[in-house]
């Protein structure tokens, strides 16, 4: 009698069909956590009315999610290396699903903010595990295609938030933007438990001092950028930023001296000798800056200048979501075949052209249908950047560092998004009439040029020995 081959739970290798099935399970949860970054925006007037919330309280419903999502990422990425990516993903999904239920049931704005904070923490446990697992279960020459699906999900979720949120709020109430996560979360738990294998994990413990230093530094930086524009940049906030800089210096020193102290670094600095990883982490922060910062001026311009309602404005972005989601899987497959810099440079080129078009359209206040041009360009730009950039950044790193690398990569993306929101908001307030919108797009052009320069330095093969 023949024996069934054992499930490959202690190896990083999977049959290709099983790897694709595992990825589809992971993408269900990944879609949810990115959707929840933007879906809440359209419900903010209802929070103000139904929960008797102040403007500052309403802002915190969004801010606290981004804060608790971004701050722990360096740690949660490493937790996947230590305790297993599948285990940490499942824990994160339980936290995210239960806190989503709590959000929908919240009867006061304070309870909603607390539940959103827990939701963000659950998302931080989930996000880095998806990238780590992709790079462990797919062979090297198929990771671009896998990242193509991952990139399609990321782009589609981020862009669909306002549109889907508008429909849900209009027809069934704001509570359902949270309740909808519960059945999807349960499905994700079942699929991941069944289809994602248990992978080998690191044996060393995580350095507690590094955890403290990373949390302080990322919290101080993100909180300062997030709340500075709303609080008017008081002196104590600058003090917090200075403390964050000090904590960051301490964190780097702890990583540098980890071996000497007989412990494992939270972020092995040797990873940054890998040229593609270092450049990719920088370029994805530029993308985070632009994607995170442009949605607000675009939506405000469409509603305040072009006299659209929220749903009409969201529908103008449909070409961006459709093109990005459709294109990313095909671009991912190309990333396995041609030089990595080519696709990323094309993507940043489209993004730069879109920002230039937005600057011109917003400055001149031309007809609303002209906004479809930058929407199409942004769709192509997102489709050409996310998956090639991710695949190239992670492709040559050693397996034992993938969790830490995923944490760094996702942290730089989130910090870029927060920085973009703060910087673009400040530029908009300095302008007069439509010039504020246009000037914010000029800032995006500058940032995108730096991203374009970074990806132009990608190499086809990196020195993996340096990373090892």
Region annotations inferred by a language model:
Residues 171-283, 290, 308-309, 316, ...:
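Hydrophobic transmembrane-helix bundles of small-molecule transporters
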Residues 71, 125, 216-219, 293, ...:
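Residue-level signal for the membrane-embedded core of alpha-helical transmembrane segments
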Residues 467-468:
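Short, highly charged, low-complexity non-transmembrane loops/tails of multi-pass membrane proteins
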Residues 20-35, 40-42, 51, 55, ...:
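12-transmembrane solute porter fold
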Residues 104-111, 193-196, 225-231, 252-259, ...:
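Transmembrane helix-loop junctions and nearby membrane-interface residues
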Residues 158-159, 206, 417:
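Charged, glycine-enriched surface loops/patches
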Residues 133, 167, 195, 223, ...:
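A residue-level signal for alpha-helical anchor/packing sites in multi-pass solute transporters
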Residues 2-194, 327-331, 335-352, 356-363, ...:
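Transmembrane-helix bundle of Major Facilitator Superfamily
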């Amino acid at each position: 009698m023949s024996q069934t081959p054992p499930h490959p739970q202690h190896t990083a290798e999977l049959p290709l069909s099983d790897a694709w099935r595992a990825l589809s399970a992971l993408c269900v949860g990944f879609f949810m956590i990115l959707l929840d970054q933007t879906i809440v925006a359209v419900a903010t007037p209802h929070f103000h009315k139904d929960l008797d919330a102040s403007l500052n309280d309403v802002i915190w419903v969004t801010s606290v999610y981004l804060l608790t999502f971004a701050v722990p990422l360096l740690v949660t990425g490493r937790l996947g290396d230590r305790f297993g990516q599948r285990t940490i993903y499942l824990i994160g999904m339980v936290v995210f699903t239960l806190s989503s239920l709590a959000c929908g049931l919240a009867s006061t704005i304070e309870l909603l903010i607390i539940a959103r904070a827990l939701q963000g923490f659950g998302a931080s446990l989930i996000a880095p595990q998806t990238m780590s697992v992709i790079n462990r279960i797919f062979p090297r020459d198929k990771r671009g295609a896998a990242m193509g699906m991952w990139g399609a999900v990321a782009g589609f979720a981020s862009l669909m938030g306002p549109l889907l949120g508008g429909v849900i709020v209009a027809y069934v109430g704001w509570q359902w933007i949270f309740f909808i996560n519960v059945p999807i979360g349960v499905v994700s738990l079942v699929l991941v438990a069944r289809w994602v294998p248990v992978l080998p994990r690191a044996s060393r413990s995580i350095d507690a001092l590094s955890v403290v230093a990373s949390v302080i530094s990322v919290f101080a930086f993100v909180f300062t950028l997030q709340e500075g524009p709303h609080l008017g940049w008081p002196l104590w906030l600058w003090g917090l930023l200075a403390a964050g800089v000090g904590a960051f210096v301490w964190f780097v020193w702890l990583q540098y001296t980890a071996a000497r102290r007989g412990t494992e670094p939270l972020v092995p600095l040797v990873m940054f000798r890998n040229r593609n990883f270092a450049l990719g982490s920088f370029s994805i922060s530029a993308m985070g800056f632009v994607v995170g910062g442009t949605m607000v001026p675009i939506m405000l311009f469409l509603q305040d200048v072009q006299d659209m309602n929220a749903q009409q404005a969201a529908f103008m972005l449909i070409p961006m979501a459709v093109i990005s989601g459709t294109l990313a899987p095909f671009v991912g497959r190309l990333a396995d075949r041609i030089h990595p810099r080519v696709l990323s440079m094309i993507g940043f080129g489209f993004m730069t052209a879109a920002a230039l078009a937005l600057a011109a359209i917003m400055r001149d206040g031309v007809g609303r249908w002209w906004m479809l041009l930058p929407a199409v360009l942004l769709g192509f730009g997102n489709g050409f950047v996310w998956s090639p950039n991710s695949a190239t950044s992670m492709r040559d790193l050693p397996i034992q560092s993938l969790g830490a690398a995923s944490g760094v990569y996702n942290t730089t993306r989130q910090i870029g998004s927060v920085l973009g929101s703060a910087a673009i908001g400040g530029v908009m307030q300095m302008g007069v009439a439509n010039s504020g919108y246009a000037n914010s797009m000029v800032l995006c052009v500058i940032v995108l040029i730096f991203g374009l320069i970074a990806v132009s330095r990608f190499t086809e093969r990196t020195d993996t020995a340096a990373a090892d």
